[in-house]
């Protein structure tokens, strides 16, 4: 009998912690909303909307056996172990700096109490500590990281099957909250606008991957650069919340080449984008101040402007620049923005308005359903020119907006 602590792994398939916990006989699956340790990195409002609906879907898959709680995970897990006489806990690792510190402390303290903790990699293809240069230092440039550190390393783990049967321990002495008591949904109607643009949950994630591979990966290499085209996977929120594993996505695309489907350039490009996701998490692991400090220290004295009117106009999609405003309005309405548009609106903020990249990072954190601490902070530093493998600070993002400005999000039809 064991506890399976759910974090950013809201799925049954290819879930190492769940699979191993299930072998102990029976499990108690618990999700804990950590409001103690996350501090300034607590999930943003759009992310909370997604999390609410995704937890609801996962609970259905668990036959409504999922336990919900809110507070300090160490206290809650300790209480649950005591009340149900459990001495084993399983979880999949997460890699935000505050999570790493918390989990290390919990693991050490549980060991002192005679409780065994088992942790697994369920969210990355390669562990950060396994990808280092010959001199033992971390990479700061993507291409050698990806080609030498990843593609020439041990192949990622193949996806695991979903457990055929899960036995649930009947919890008698611990009171679960309801999903609604987690208070994830904002009071205003914005949440309905956000969620109406998406199908949420593990089954939706698998369907999205299958649809992408079937109809949209052909032409991905070039099409991904044009917001008006559909050559993007839109898998980022599903990956962030662990509704699908990166291993499942990786091998679904990798195996297209093995089976003779002739989209080699498109599949290679998509896999390299998966590599960028890995690289972002890798950078955050080795440079934990990435969300708030310039990776390149020479930018520390840059003379940023501090203009709240400019910032508000950018946030509201009222800059007067059609492609920027279309992107920002799409973000507010759907919780998502095409990656090319993220580069354009980000470049406009830091290089045209001269506002600090942290302002953009904070706004995206609150508005994106796929807001990921690693990707968000490394992406903004890349745009500003102060990060790893960054675009030159004087290079301004450009794009033809002719088609985009006719989109439903543009205020200038």
Which residues does each PLM region occupy?
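Hydrophobic alpha-helical scaffolding
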Residues: 41-44, 48, 132, 195-199, ...
């Amino acid at each position: 009998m064991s506890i399976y602590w759910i974090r950013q792994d809201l799925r049954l398939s290819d879930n190492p912690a769940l699979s191993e916990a299930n072998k102990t006989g029976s499990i108690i699956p618990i999700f804990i909303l950590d409001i103690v340790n996350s501090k300034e990195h607590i999930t943003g409002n759009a992310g909370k909307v997604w999390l609410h609906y995704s937890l609801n879907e996962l609970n259905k898959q668990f036959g409504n056996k999922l336990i919900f709680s809110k507070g300090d995970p160490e206290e809650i897990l300790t209480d649950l172990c005591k009340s149900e006489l459990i001495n084993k806990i399983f979880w999949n690792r997460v890699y935000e700096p505050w999570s790493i510190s918390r989990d290390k402390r919990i693991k050490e303290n549980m060991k002192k109490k005679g409780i065994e903790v088992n942790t697994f990699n369920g969210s990355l293809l390669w562990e950060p500590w396994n990808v280092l240069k010959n001199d033992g230092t971390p990479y700061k440039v993507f291409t050698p990281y990806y080609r030498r550190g990843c593609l020439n390393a041990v192949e990622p783990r193949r996806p695991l099957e979903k457990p055929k049967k899960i036995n649930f321990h009947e919890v008698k002495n611990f009171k679960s909250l309801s999903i609604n008591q987690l208070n994830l949904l904002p009071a205003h109607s914005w949440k309905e606008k956000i969620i109406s643009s998406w199908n949420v949950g593990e089954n939706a994630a698998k369907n999205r991957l299958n649809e992408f591979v079937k109809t949209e990966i052909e032409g991905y290499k070039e099409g991904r650069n044009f917001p008006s085209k559909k050559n993007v996977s839109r898998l980022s929120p599903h990956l962030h919340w662990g509704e699908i594993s990166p291993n499942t996505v990786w091998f679904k695309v990798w195996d297209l080449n093995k089976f003779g489907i002739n989209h080699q350039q498109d599949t290679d490009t998509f896999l390299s984008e998966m590599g960028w996701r890995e690289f972002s998490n890798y950078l955050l692991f080795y440079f934990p101040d990435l969300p708030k400090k310039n990776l390149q220290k020479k930018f520390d004295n840059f003379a940023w402007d501090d203009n709240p009117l400019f910032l508000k106009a950018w946030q509201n999609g009222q800059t007067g620049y059609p492609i920027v405003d279309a992107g920002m309005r799409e973000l507010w309405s759907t919780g998502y923005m095409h990656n090319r548009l993220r580069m354009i609106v980000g470049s406009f903020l830091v290089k045209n308005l001269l506002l600090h990249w942290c302002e953009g990072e904070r706004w995206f954190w609150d508005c994106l359903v796929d807001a990921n601490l690693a990707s968000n902070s490394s992406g903004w530093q890349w745009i500003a020119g102060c990060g790893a493998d960054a675009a030159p600070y004087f290079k301004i993002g450009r794009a033809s907006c002719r088609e985009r400005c006719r989109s439903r999000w543009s205020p200038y039809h």
